[in-house]
Structure formats: C-alpha cells, structure tokens
C-alpha cells in the first residue's frame, strides 16, 4: 500500500535508529517512518564487538597527525557524542549491559614505554584526557606479568550492540516512529515537492 510521512529513515541499524529517535526528540510532531530490509540490528550494528569510544578519528595519534588544528574540536565532539549515548541509555532504561570500562593500550616490551608516554603527552596537549599507567598500576587492572605499562583512556565503554539496537527500536516506537521490518527500500524518486521511497510491498510519500 501507500502511506505518507514527514521523514523516512532507511535502515534500522544504529545510525538509522538513532536518527529516528533524535528526530522525534527534537520535533515530536513529525511523522517518522523507519524502513528496514531485514530485522532490526541484524547486520553490522548488532554483530560487532560493542566498543563505544569517544574518539572519532580512529585513535588520538592518527587524529593529531591528520587534523592537528581541528583535533581538540573533534575530540570534544566525540566526548559529547559518548555522553549523549550514555544519557539516552540511562534516560530510557535501555537494558544493553553498557559499562564505562575505559581502554588500555599496553606495552609488552620496555622499549615501548617511551612511545606510550609520548602518546599521552601529545594527546593531553590536544585535549584528550588520557593517562600513562606504570607496570604496577596496569597489572592491578589486568593481572598479566607481560604488561610493562599502558595508556589509559577513560572515554571508552562496552555494550551489547544487538540489545542496544532493540532498545533503541523500543524507544523509537514509544516516541511514535513507525517501524517496518522486511521492507527493503528499492528506489528513491522525486514526487511533487517531496520524495517517494518504494519497497517490494508498498511506497512511502513525503
């Protein structure tokens, strides 16, 4: 059949689910439809290691090397994003085993210590709240005699990604989002002043 919506979101992975939720949070009056070709969170969003990091530059050294002038802003944006994830999980009671675990980048050889210390000095100078841990403190967190030291990044968590997806879907529906699983988008075409999204079994007009 044919239905209408103010906003159509394609894909019920984490990006699509969060887009739909944020749209309804900001504009509750919007009629939002979310189309998913399979099941909610069945692909990469629900089948990953569950690491939730504030870094949006694939690590501090990489970000500083590529975008030195913008890194502090990028780091602040990443931290704000992590806080937003945590707030959404807490505010809506999403049961997804989220833990602010932190992350350790460890040294297993003495010569690696200087590199880790340089990492910390450089990252902190650009706004990242990381710490160098000596061998004793590192082994207190992870009982292995191999570890000579570590960089500790507190802005990292871990989550059950599938349960996060299912929880976000529940929140989206509670906010009024209409979710259609097994409805892969086949085409996107202009339609009057809006757009038309077609699936195998119907069409959504905006």
Question: Language-model segments: which ranges?
Answer:
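Dinucleotide-binding Rossmann-like beta1-alpha1 core, especially the glycine-rich loop
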Residues: 54-137
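Short beta-strand "acidic-cap" motif of Rossmann-like dinucleotide-binding folds
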Residues: 30-36, 132
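Short hydrophobic core segments
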Residues: 7-10, 35, 185, 204-206
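Extreme N-terminal leader/targeting segments of oxidoreductases
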Residues: 1-7, 25-26, 30-31
């Amino acid at each position: 059949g044919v239905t209408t919506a103010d906003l159509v979101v394609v894909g019920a992975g984490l990006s699509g689910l969060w887009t739909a939720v944020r749209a309804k949070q900001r504009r509750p009056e919007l009629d939002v439809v979310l189309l998913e070709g399979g099941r909610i969170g069945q692909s990469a969003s629900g089948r990953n290691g569950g690491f939730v990091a504030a870094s949006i530059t694939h690590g501090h050294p990489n970000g500083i090397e590529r975008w030195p002038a913008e890194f502090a802003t990028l780091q602040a944006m990443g931290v704000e994003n992590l806080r937003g994830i945590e707030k959404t999980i807490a505010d809506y009671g999403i049961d997804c085993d989220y833990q602010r675990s932190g992350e350790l980048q460890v040294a297993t050889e003495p010569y690696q210590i200087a590199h880790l210390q340089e990492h910390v000095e450089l990252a902190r100078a650009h706004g990242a709240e990381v710490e160098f841990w000596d061998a004793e403190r590192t082994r207190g967190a992870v009982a292995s005699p191999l570890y000579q030291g570590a960089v500790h990044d507190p802005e990292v968590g871990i989550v059950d990604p599938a349960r996060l997806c299912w929880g976000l879907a529940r929140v989206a529906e509670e906010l009024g989002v209409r979710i259609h699983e097994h409805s892969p988008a086949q085409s996107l075409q202009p339609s009057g002043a809006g757009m038309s999204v077609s699936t195998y079994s119907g069409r959504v007009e905006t």
